[in-house]
Design a protein with these regions (language model features):
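Conserved cytochrome P450 K-helix E-x-x-R motif and the immediately C-terminal K′/meander segment
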Residues: 1-18, 195, 276, 297-337, ...
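Cytochrome P450 substrate-recognition site 1
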Residues: 1-97, 101, 122, 127-134, ...
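Classical protein tyrosine phosphatase
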Residues: 32-42, 48-51, 138-150, 258-284, ...
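Cytochrome P450 heme-thiolate monooxygenase catalytic core
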Residues: 54-62, 96-265, 281, 298-299
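Cytochrome P450 heme-binding "Cys pocket" and the immediately downstream C-terminal segment
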Residues: 145, 276-278, 397-437
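Cytochrome P450 heme-thiolate "Cys pocket" and heme-binding signature region
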Residues: 251, 373-404, 429-433
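Conserved cytochrome P450 K-helix/beta-meander segment immediately N-terminal to the heme-binding cysteine loop
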Residues: 301, 325, 347-375
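C-terminal helix/juxtamembrane-tail motif
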Residues: 436-462
């Protein structure tokens, strides 16, 4: 399955062999889960037994001294990092503090699209740059001067950290990491990123020295690196927050924040283009709720109920991570099957989100299916787990959703859209690639026609 679309291949196997399968993938005993009932066994009844992630070769190379928060073993270090992320870095209060950044960067995106003057625009790239700029300003306090280097790093990691490369399937054969060119390539890229992160952290340390005693200024301008440096000075957390840990957390937040939000936003727009009825309904709602305003503000999003359904349906059909990996911390029994300790568990979220047992007409994009539904993406609905579940559920849900909804509202409000080169909606290529996330295989090329007059009053601090 390496090099193909493993989530598709595994779904086809599950159709023939059932929702729980035992596979021998190279040296790795793997249990594949493809239904909500089986997900409940893993992320519900036996969640603590599966609170571990398996080792991935690419992550070993890119993390600092095995300090990855996302992939670290379940234990005291992971618990402390999780608490820091939930309470300090990605809390709702912190996410709301970045509201002006999202609004300003969305406005920059609108100006970029307007400047295309009716020519075809690469919406995939425009959205990726937008989310990259939002994430870098939230993390570093300013747009990243090293955007190209970070995006190159993000591209490589996304492709290689899916867990289906040869070094992951045959971990005892160490030289495969070199034959596959994975390790040398990532090491070179990581060295470049390390120099950049050292520079960013050093700049923030100097800035914090200059702001000592000025708490009002500090709180107004505090970004995620500032938060981590302040935590480093705390007696309660300094044991965990070492310099290399700060760099690793920033790198992982940057990669996760940029990739998942941009991928989901582009898929949402692609599905609306492919389904004109949905596009028209979402666009009509945005324009009715805003009633001729010249700018979409984040507080306006609360009234866009149909847009929220579009995002939910996108996450069902295009889960940010199509395959979710866990590892058994102890021997246990699942649905009558004995699962040995250190068995790799792969939950096919792609298959679960399209399971006809739980979803009517699962291959069709129908946002209305979530009307008056209690199904939610925060981990309690096992048929719908785009952000995972249990202790390992994604801590950045609030940050991610905020970075998806506002750009979509802006794009729908200010422009009417058509595909380039006369391509019809039903002919839009919806092929995907495989990696940590599942992106479009080809960029989404669109032609924008300005519709609603827009202006920006510049009332936010830069």
């Amino acid at each position: 399955m390496a090099g193909s679309l493993p989530h598709h291949s595994l779904r086809e196997l599950a159709r023939r062999h059932g929702p729980i399968m035992r596979l021998q993938l190279g040296e790795i005993l793997t249990i594949v889960i493809s239904s909500a009932d089986m997900v409940k066994e893993i992320l519900g009844k036996n969640e603590l037994a599966f609170a571990q992630r398996p080792e991935i070769a690419a992550v070993e190379v890119m993390s600092y001294e095995n300090s990855s928060f996302v992939y670290s073993p379940y234990g005291e270090y992971w618990k402390e990092m999780r608490k820091i992320c939930m309470l300090e870095l990605l809390s709702m209060k912190r996410v709301l503090s970045f509201r002006s950044i999202r609004e300003e960067e969305c406005w920059n995106m609108i100006k970029t699209i307007q400047s295309s003057q009716g020519k075809p625009a690469n919406l995939s790239k425009i959205v990726l740059n937008l989310i990259n700029d939002v994430t870098s300003r939230a993390a570093f306090g300013e747009k990243c001067k090293y955007r190209d280097e970070f995006l190159s790093f993000l591209e490589e990691v996304t492709l290689l950290a899916g867990g289906f490369e040869l070094p992951d399937l045959f971990p005892s054969i160490w030289f495969l990491r070199y034959l596959s060119r994975m390790k040398p390539a990532l090491e070179r890229l990581h060295k470049k990123i390390d120099v950049i992160l050292d520079h960013i952290v050093a700049e923030h340390e100097e800035k914090l020295k200059g702001n000592r005693g000025n708490n009002e200024e500090k709180n107004a301008r505090e970004d995620l690196v500032d938060v981590l440096l302040n935590l480093q000075k705390s007696s309660e957390t300094n044991y965990f927050i070492k310099p290399h840990v700060i760099k690793n957390i920033v790198m992982e937040l940057f990669c996760a924040g940029s990739d998942t939000s941009s991928t989901t936003t582009v898929w949402a727009f692609s599905e609306m283009v492919r389904n004109p009825r949905v596009m028209e309904k979402a666009q009509a709602e945005v324009r009715a709720v805003l009633k001729g305003k010249t700018q979409v503000r984040e507080q306006d999003i609360q009234g866009l109920e149909y847009l929220k359904l579009v995002v939910k349906e996108t996450l069902r059909m295009h889960s940010p991570g199509p395959l979710m990996a866990r590892e058994s911390r102890e021997a246990c029994t699942i649905n009558g099957y004995e699962i040995p300790k250190k068995t790799k568990i792969v939950i096919n979220t792609y298959a679960v989100g399209r399971d006809p047992e739980f979803w009517s007409d699962p291959e069709s994009f129908v946002p209305e299916r979530f009307l008056n539904s209690s199904v939610d993406f925060r981990g309690s609905s096992f048929e719908y787990i785009p952000f995972g579940g249990g202790r390992r559920i994604c801590p950045g849900i609030n940050f991610g959703i905020a970075n998806i909804e506002l750009p979509l509202a802006q794009l729908l409000y200010h422009f009417d859209w058509s595909l380039a080169d006369g391509v019809k909606a039903q002919d839009l290529d919806m092929s995907e690639t495989f990696g940590i996330t599942s992106r479009r295989k080809t960029p989404l090329i669109m032609v924008a026609e300005p519709c609603v007059p827009f202006s920006y009053d510049g009332d936010h601090d830069k």
